[in-house]
């Protein structure tokens, strides 16, 4: 069931006064769900929970994190055809694309589970000391990758599964030991809620700390800006336009404590339809373009 609410840790919440609806581009109508935008209080609560969860989650073994990631994949798979139907109603994309993208997403989660289970990602390096070296002794140098802290992930418009709520950015952050706050994309917020429910359920089943995952809704830029500026957020993952990514980068750089923005940015590719082709083959062109 789609509630239209935000996930603040493992709790559904709808404190905001603003609601919006997603759009079905195939039927050219609004979808029925009322999505509630996150309030400032909910933004703060999600960030605080993530920071608190980080204290525990950062120390959890790779084996336990792998169990969590695999449980997420299993729970998403268990959502079955209903998830695919909601995906198509918000994206207009056909069932075949939905199934393919879901499969890709499950594969990403399970691949990161195997990677974190092996432990090679920490890239440990030990350069032992040589105190007897002349003219200066050599110091002992040791290096290892460690989690940064809570990561903010922005859902992408064109990949509701693979680059959004449980997509590659989320899987990578969780594998590294970083709690995740997702700013859902307003074009597929209901799909995001269903996937969020799977993540929250997986977290509960595998004993993860409350706040390891949150999902916040917004149709504008305010919630995203608040999250990027929040001192408890330590990194940002973004897939989208150059303009949007640059704006987030600038916000992150202007913080008292600047944070990294890992962004895949691109432009809109022009598609030219000539009048004769549009008159004769409009439906088939639209299906090919969407699929």
Task: Please give the residue ranges for each predicted region.
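General beta-strand structural signal in soluble alpha/beta enzymes
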Residues: 182, 215, 238-240, 261-264
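N-terminal Rossmann-like NAD(P)+-binding subdomain of aldehyde/semialdehyde dehydrogenases
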Residues: 1-136
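Residue-level signal for inorganic ion chemistry
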Residues: 28-29, 65, 87, 177, ...
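A structured beta-alpha segment of the ubiquitous adenosine-cofactor-binding alpha/beta core
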Residues: 140-141, 214-237
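Conserved small-residue-rich beta-alpha loop and adjacent elements
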Residues: 123-206
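Short, surface-exposed connector motifs at secondary-structure boundaries
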Residues: 176-181, 207-210, 228-235
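Hydrophobic packing residues within well-ordered alpha-helices of enzyme cores
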Residues: 109, 192-195, 227, 248
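ALDH superfamily catalytic-core signature
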Residues: 198-201, 244-291
